[in-house]
From Swiss-Prot:
Belongs to the methyltransferase superfamily. This is Uncharacterized methyltransferase Rv0089. One of its GO terms (biological process) is methylation. InterPro entries: Methyltransf_11, SAM-dependent_MTases_sf.
């Protein structure tokens, strides 16, 4: 089967690249259809994929039944997971589903081992301050969907996101000292952070 494409899947490779070589244990938060978790499982021995949506998680489990992934149906905010238990925590297009972004970022950061990596691709609410970026992203995404053929994921859609780019930056600065925030094509934002040793 050909690799499906949409603007979310486009960033799976970027998130994979953010996970350092030698990583042993990774958590995929809001794994949805499981494509990122399956990609990571090709090179990382212990992958845990968590999603709150049971039907979506079942489809991911079925699709990647042979992948060495621990599938977990849970709310990331209340799931029983070890603090500082993962060398890397990744999330693609899921953070904006959690209304309290500040608490969610704190939770995700707390799951990363000292020296480990947090890498999140998320959406932000369009704003006048970033209007040109949002407009060009929307146009680029529409063109890419027509050229590449957009694969429709089965996960729920949440729009609009709960925060603007300015608000997200404020939360990240307060909770994840030294984190990097980058605007990406297709209207996404990348947050990367290395947990202090």
């Amino acid at each position: 089967m050909d690799q499906p494409w949409n603007a979310n899947i486009h960033y799976d490779a970027l998130l994979d690249a953010m996970v350092p070589l030698g990583t042993q244990c990774v958590l995929d938060v809001g794994c949805g259809d499981g494509l990122l978790a399956a990609r990571l499982a090709r090179r990382i021995p212990y992958v845990t994929a968590v999603d709150i949506d049971a039907p979506v998680l079942r489809r991911a489990q079925t699709r990647f039944a042979n992948a060495p992934i621990r599938w977990l149906h849970a709310d990331i905010m209340t799931a029983e997971l070890p603090n500082a238990g993962f060398d890397a925590v990744v999330s693609n297009a899921a953070l904006h589903h959690i209304e309290d972004t500040r608490t969610a970022l704190s939770r995700l950061g707390g799951l990363v081992t000292p020296g480990g990596t947090l890498a999140v691709v998320t959406f932000v609410t369009p704003s006048l301050r970033n209007g040109l970026w949002h407009l060009t992203s929307w146009v680029a995404c529409g063109m890419a969907n027509r050229v590449k053929g957009k694969w429709e994921h089965s996960a729920p859609i949440k729009w609009p996101p709960p925060q603007t780019l300015h608000e997200l930056r404020s939360h990240v600065r307060a909770l994840l000292p030294g984190a990097c925030i980058r605007r990406l094509l297709y209207g996404r934002v990348l947050v990367t952070w290395r947990a202090p040793v």
